[in-house]
Amino acid sequence: MKLPITLLTLAALSFHSLAQEESLTPIFNGRNLDGWNTDDALVASHWLISDGQIIGDNPDKKGSVLWTKANYNNYELNLYFQTDSPDYDSGVFVRGPSHQVQIGVSRSLKIDLTGCIYCPKDLQGKYPIQSDKVKTTHKLGEWNALKIRVINNRIVTHLNGELINDYMTAAMPKEGPIGLQVHAGVHQKMRFKNLEIQPTRYDEPGVVEPQYDGIPVPVPNGATVLFDGKDLSLWRGMPRKGVENPAGEVRWKVESGFMQVTPRQGGITLKEPLLTSGHLHIEWATPAEVTDQGQGRGNSGVFIQGFPEVQVLDSFNNKTYHDGQASALYKHAPPLVNASRGPGKWQKYDIHFSRAEVENGKVTKPAYLTVYHNGILTQDKIPFLNRAQNGGLSLQDHNNPVRFRNIWFLPTE
């Protein structure tokens, strides 16, 4: 059943409302390290239990990580940490060793990164550096409350009740263990207690009535038309695996005011970059004849300025994974709701994005991405720290003859 929805209702939807939360469960019983890997010699010599606390102590200045035996996917982790060490470098690894929530002063960057995300091998390139809130929120020598929320490729941290970081990674493992670290190079004694985890899962996005009738939207004053329905002179072709295209030949066809993907011949990309923040409007339609299901049904995508793919898919009565539906940020964030029209019907995306602001190599304002699908808010100002700003705009060939029309860009800078 489709549900009526209003802008007020949509404004009330949040990142937290996407997920159904289960009860909090201790991952440390306060007595021993049952449930933690203790086979490693460094673990045995560096970690102990006292007064209901896990204590990491490295007088030899060697590094060690205490890992859970269990792997975790999406969750909220709550814990307390404390140290009397004047110099310390610790952290909590999420889903294995690639992404860490830092505690203390980074040995490499020489600044307090508590609550920030340390992931130097992230495909985004640079990773978030110190949050100004750390300076006033982190209580040295006292117990600090750390909350870590991991949903798909997003990591959100709160320190003593204050939001410190909201970070969308380029890629991270689907699941993995949680690790407590004492870093090499400095003697430190880290204390952890009250470690509790709350697994989360996504519900199927609710189906709502689209607020779009399929009529082309007029181009506003000041907008640049990127496809007028006549030719693809502003675009060039892209190679794909097994298909060479050194000359950038566009192999899609144009007819009746729309362009159409030629399956397995490569996507297309705009020749000139979009160098400002702005509003991208694009209309699209999946094939009217349904010949497949899931990800094989009207699949394409919109890539803009290095943000994750805005998924194009026939999601009308079509079950698939939540972060692969129409208007999902593919494998990053599912849509708030499913606002899809039926197969063969024209649909529209209005994608609003702002570029990150950087001063002296430090991000002072993250990039943001908001998506409206058929007039309904489906991605609400998703932040991206240090997202590569390459200015590109590309449309994907995912083996389906998806159509596009009426593409324009309105700068907001």
Language-model features: locations:
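Bacterial Sec-dependent N-terminal signal peptides
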Residues: 1-21
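Carbohydrate-interacting regions of secretory-pathway proteins
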Residues: 20-413
